[in-house]
Amino acid sequence: MKFLIVVDMQNDFITGSLGTKEAEAILPKVLEKIRTYCPEQIFVTQDTHPDNYLETNEGRHLPVAHCIAGSEGHALNPLVAEALEGVPADHFICKPTFGSPLLAEKLKTAAGSDTPEIELVGLCTGICVLSNAILCKATFPESDVSVDAACCACVTPQSHDTALSAMKLCQIDICNEGSEPWRE
């Protein structure tokens, strides 16, 4: 079975406090990708932080309040939310940090005894996409894990490219590198 992981396509990462033009540019590609999967094959992560985010370890390293639980910035982009209609409620994962061990557990349950194929898209390539791709590879060492670069963006184009290089070293397949819509 093949699964799609949609990573953190939230307002704060697209148009909010950590938004970038690159994140906005990938939106049509991500919507297109979502539509190629059955809802049962899709898992969705959402970065989720408390009101005191700036006092946390992550907040001290990245002092920009974002994805505060219950805020507009925490919500999925409305077009993404619409495209994800029909995805089972238990496939949505609020995660308090970059990678989600809960995602790996849910994928194990969904895959059963199969060796799943896993594709990741979303934001930010160098933090949450990278972390979850490596978690998936560690959980399923015999699985093909891939990232569609045309459906990802990072803080800068350079950090995106660095993350893709790091994932390649971990035997994560990178598709559509160089075809990112924000490179045009």
Q: Residue spans of the language-model regions?
A:
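Active-site catalytic pocket residues across diverse enzymes, especially alpha/beta-hydrolases
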Residues: 84, 107, 111, 139-140
